[in-house]
Amino acid sequence: MLDPNLLRTEPDAVAEKLARRGFKLDVDKLRALEERRKVLQVQTENLQAERNSRSKSIGQAKARGEDIEPLRLEVNKLGEQLDAAKSELETLLAEIRDIALAIPNIPHDDVPVGRDENDNVEVSRWGTPRQFDFEVRDHVTLGEMHGGLDFAAAVKLTGSRFVVMKGQLARLHRALAQFMLDLHTEQHGYSENYVPYLVNQDTLYGTGQLPKFAGDLFHTRPLEEEADSSNYALIPTAEVPLTNLVRDEIIDEDDLPIKMTAHTPCFRSEAGSYGRDTRGLIRMHQFDKVEMVQIVRPEDSMAALEEMTGHAEKVLQLLGLPYRKVALCTGDMGFSACKTYDLEVWVPAQNTYREISSCSNVWDFQARRMQARCRSKSDKKTRLVHTLNGSGLAVGRTLVALMENYQQADGRIEIPEVLRPYMRGLEYIG
């Protein structure tokens, strides 16, 4: 959520920056609402003061033995006017808040300007894609060869965009997640967390999934039903519960940064993705991911983004998977992000790079929604923290890349050395 004061005092400047990401801010409407808010605010305060004054006069008139009925009627009328003004003001403030909640974050000044993924800027590459001397099989074919990926069984159990993993491929999938967690906790300084997979609406508002992206979530009950303690949604990413751990908290600056990680399933409806990536593990309704979250001082967030992206890169480097680092343009960034790097891993069967990690600096956008603040040791003043999140990595897509990049001519899959301790020394699947 953007700073309301900024929207009130510099709407044109905000609109200009948001236009770079393809968002049109209705400045005229905002101004009109703000002017009406000021009028109602003054009207409410004046009515309250007048009512208080008249109420005091009733006591004085009564003490003098005067007829207080006219004053009482006047106070009642003022009370009705005050209630009406308060009601209108509350409705207006709710409308302003709804508009504010639908406004995306302002892109950082060094984010490349563009409309979509075609305007993203490649920053660097690591590794050289392998040249195969045999016909490359995709991960679906390899999975079927080894009996490890059963999409038909998942359709029977649930539906499309799900999978049943079996045997050594299921073990390899688990090994990948364990390897990522061990790397981030033992070498990168993150604390491991186990979090709920169901969260309430306040939590989803905090990180920006609600109200704009309600259709992307799996809800336990229809959203239009009255919210209560049982109105949950499945998490689309561990970013949601991890980041909300600091909601309504004031953190001593000396305790920052806070670096957290978690391995969870993620659940997404993939609304708007009909017909895209229908084969295999690339786009699923349920997939596993190891997430990284950092809570930092505002002045440290840009450096933290570079660090976090490097942590995700380290996973790919240790696995020996070629990838490229891409700076997302303004039109391709997520709703809450002010700057984002994507890591795209080489997928041989598709002869292209595919996203496997997205690392974002969210600035104070989520912190303002969550009222997550830090306190200075010197002057005891509080300010909003900055939050960052990144995939470290998407486990299913890492499995895809590993299977295809490490496949052998006979269909066997070589296991990278760093994973063999998690596979009881196994060198090949198949």
Curated annotation (Swiss-Prot):
<dbReference type="Pfam" id="PF02403">
    <property type="entry name" value="Seryl_tRNA_N"/>
</dbReference>
<dbReference type="GO" id="GO:0006434">
    <property type="term" value="P:seryl-tRNA aminoacylation"/>
</dbReference>
<dbReference type="InterPro" id="IPR033729">
    <property type="entry name" value="SerRS_core"/>
</dbReference>
<comment type="function">
    <text>Catalyzes the attachment of serine to tRNA(Ser). Is also able to aminoacylate tRNA(Sec) with serine, to form the misacylated tRNA L-seryl-tRNA(Sec), which will be further converted into selenocysteinyl-tRNA(Sec).</text>
</comment>
<dbReference type="GO" id="GO:0016260">
    <property type="term" value="P:selenocysteine biosynthetic process"/>
</dbReference>
<comment type="pathway">
    <text>Aminoacyl-tRNA biosynthesis; selenocysteinyl-tRNA(Sec) biosynthesis; L-seryl-tRNA(Sec) from L-serine and tRNA(Sec): step 1/1.</text>
</comment>
<dbReference type="InterPro" id="IPR010978">
    <property type="entry name" value="tRNA-bd_arm"/>
</dbReference>
<dbReference type="GO" id="GO:0005524">
    <property type="term" value="F:ATP binding"/>
</dbReference>
<dbReference type="InterPro" id="IPR006195">
    <property type="entry name" value="aa-tRNA-synth_II"/>
</dbReference>
<protein>
    <recommendedName>
        <fullName>Serine--tRNA ligase</fullName>
        <ecNumber>6.1.1.11</ecNumber>
    </recommendedName>
</protein>
<feature type="binding site">
    <location>
        <begin position="268"/>
        <end position="270"/>
    </location>
    <ligand>
        <name>ATP</name>
    </ligand>
</feature>
<dbReference type="InterPro" id="IPR002314">
    <property type="entry name" value="aa-tRNA-synt_IIb"/>
</dbReference>
<feature type="binding site">
    <location>
        <begin position="237"/>
        <end position="239"/>
    </location>
    <ligand>
        <name>L-serine</name>
    </ligand>
</feature>
<keyword id="KW-0067">ATP-binding</keyword>
<dbReference type="Pfam" id="PF00587">
    <property type="entry name" value="tRNA-synt_2b"/>
</dbReference>
<keyword id="KW-0963">Cytoplasm</keyword>
<dbReference type="InterPro" id="IPR045864">
    <property type="entry name" value="aa-tRNA-synth_II/BPL/LPL"/>
</dbReference>
<dbReference type="GO" id="GO:0005737">
    <property type="term" value="C:cytoplasm"/>
</dbReference>
<dbReference type="GO" id="GO:0004828">
    <property type="term" value="F:serine-tRNA ligase activity"/>
</dbReference>
<comment type="similarity">
    <text>Belongs to the class-II aminoacyl-tRNA synthetase family. Type-1 seryl-tRNA synthetase subfamily.</text>
</comment>
<keyword id="KW-0648">Protein biosynthesis</keyword>
<keyword id="KW-0436">Ligase</keyword>
<feature type="binding site">
    <location>
        <begin position="355"/>
        <end position="358"/>
    </location>
    <ligand>
        <name>ATP</name>
    </ligand>
</feature>
<dbReference type="InterPro" id="IPR015866">
    <property type="entry name" value="Ser-tRNA-synth_1_N"/>
</dbReference>
<feature type="binding site">
    <location>
        <position position="291"/>
    </location>
    <ligand>
        <name>L-serine</name>
    </ligand>
</feature>
<dbReference type="InterPro" id="IPR002317">
    <property type="entry name" value="Ser-tRNA-ligase_type_1"/>
</dbReference>
<comment type="subunit">
    <text>Homodimer. The tRNA molecule binds across the dimer.</text>
</comment>
<keyword id="KW-0030">Aminoacyl-tRNA synthetase</keyword>
<dbReference type="InterPro" id="IPR042103">
    <property type="entry name" value="SerRS_1_N_sf"/>
</dbReference>
<feature type="binding site">
    <location>
        <position position="391"/>
    </location>
    <ligand>
        <name>L-serine</name>
    </ligand>
</feature>
<keyword id="KW-0547">Nucleotide-binding</keyword>
